[in-house]
């Protein structure tokens, strides 16, 4: 009997691989499939509101009864009272990583936190939200630069003062905001089904 499917709406292959690993890969009781839908991103500071708006669009596009989730991640600087937050993707796209780091040059506090918010619609159409958070420091880029801001974020829990980009995926997934949020989703799915 085939495993039930859950749709992850993303066009990011790195994110898909990482999430598949966190959710159990081939050993999970469901199959993770990707739908790279082009969803409008609500602009705002409320991450839960942004994720739920994206989820509503995904449910509309895929049709009711199909389990689906979306994910949104923010990187917030302590000195900027939460900014760039959900806008980090656009800051990096517009300015590049080096200039994003440079924004904190005149501040002693380089503290930051990352938050991942997952909005999930189960097969009955009920909506669920899961969120993970990790504190860290903004540093000059170290490691690969092919996955967002991983190379400029050094989590406080890093054993060797590594950025996400320098860490082994398994180590990163244990302490990252995405790993924490998806661990909650995984627990929900494994305990209640899809």
Curated annotation (Swiss-Prot):
Identify the GO cellular component terms for this protein.
cytoplasm; nucleus
The alphabetized list of GO BP terms reads: deoxyribonucleoside triphosphate catabolic process; nucleotide metabolic process
Keyword Transferase included in the entry's annotation? no
Question: Which residues participate in Mg(2+) binding?
Answer: 41
Q: Which residues bind ITP?
A: 10-15, 54, 72-73, 89, 147-150, 172, 177-178
Main location group:
cytoplasm
Q: Which reaction does it catalyse?
A: ITP + H2O = IMP + diphosphate + H(+); dITP + H2O = dIMP + diphosphate + H(+); XTP + H2O = XMP + diphosphate + H(+)
**What is the enzyme's main class?**
hydrolase
Superkingdom: Eukaryota
Q: Where in the cell is it found?
A: Cytoplasm; Nucleus
**Keyword Cytoplasm attributed:** yes
The EC designation for this entry is 3.6.1.66
The record's comment on cofactor binding reads:
Binds 1 divalent metal cation per subunit; can use either Mg(2+) or Mn(2+).
Q: Which UniProt keywords apply?
A: Cytoplasm, Hydrolase, Magnesium, Manganese, Metal-binding, Nucleotide metabolism, Nucleotide-binding, Nucleus
Q: Which terms does the record give in the GO molecular function aspect?
A: dITP diphosphatase activity; ITP diphosphatase activity; metal ion binding; nucleotide binding; XTP diphosphatase activity
Name the cofactor(s) required for activity, per the record: Mg(2+); Mn(2+)
Q: What exactly does this protein do?
A: Pyrophosphatase that hydrolyzes non-canonical purine nucleotides such as inosine triphosphate (ITP), deoxyinosine triphosphate (dITP) or xanthosine 5'-triphosphate (XTP) to their respective monophosphate derivatives. The enzyme does not distinguish between the deoxy- and ribose forms. Probably excludes non-canonical purines from RNA and DNA precursor pools, thus preventing their incorporation into RNA and DNA and avoiding chromosomal lesions.
Q: Which family does it belong to?
A: Belongs to the HAM1 NTPase family.
Subunit notes for this chain?
Homodimer.
Mind telling me which NCBIfam families this protein's record contains?
RdgB/HAM1 family non-canonical purine NTP pyrophosphatase
HAMAP family hit by this protein = HAM1_NTPase (MF_03148)
User: In its UniProt entry, what is this protein called?
Assistant: Inosine triphosphate pyrophosphatase
Q: Can you name the source organism?
A: Kluyveromyces lactis (strain ATCC 8585 / CBS 2359 / DSM 70799 / NBRC 1267 / NRRL Y-1140 / WM37)
What lineage, starting at the top, does this entry show?
A: Eukaryota, Fungi, Dikarya, Ascomycota, Saccharomycotina
Its encoding gene is what? HAM1
């Amino acid at each position: 009997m085939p495993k039930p499917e859950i749709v992850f709406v993303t066009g990011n292959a790195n994110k898909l691989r990482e999430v598949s690993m966190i959710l159990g890969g081939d050993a999970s009781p469901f199959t993770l499939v990707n739908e790279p839908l082009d969803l409008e991103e609500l602009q705002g500071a409320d991450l839960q509101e942004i994720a739920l708006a994206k989820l509503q669009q995904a449910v509309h596009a895929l049709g009711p009864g199909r389990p689906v989730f979306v994910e949104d991640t923010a990187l917030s600087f302590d000195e900027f009272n939460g900014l760039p937050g959900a806008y980090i993707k656009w800051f990096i796209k517009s300015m590049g990583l080096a200039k994003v780091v440079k924004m904190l040059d005149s501040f002693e506090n380089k503290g930051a936190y990352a938050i991942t918010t997952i909005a999930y619609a189960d097969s009955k159409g009920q909506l669920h939200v899961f969120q993970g958070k990790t504190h860290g420091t903004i540093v000059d880029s170290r490691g690969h630069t092919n996955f967002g801001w991983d190379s400029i974020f050094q989590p406080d829990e890093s054993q060797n003062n590594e950025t996400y980009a320098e860490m082994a995926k398994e180590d990163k997934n244990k302490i990252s905001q995405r790993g924490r949020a998806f661990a909650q989703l995984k627990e929900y799915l494994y305990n209640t089904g899809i």
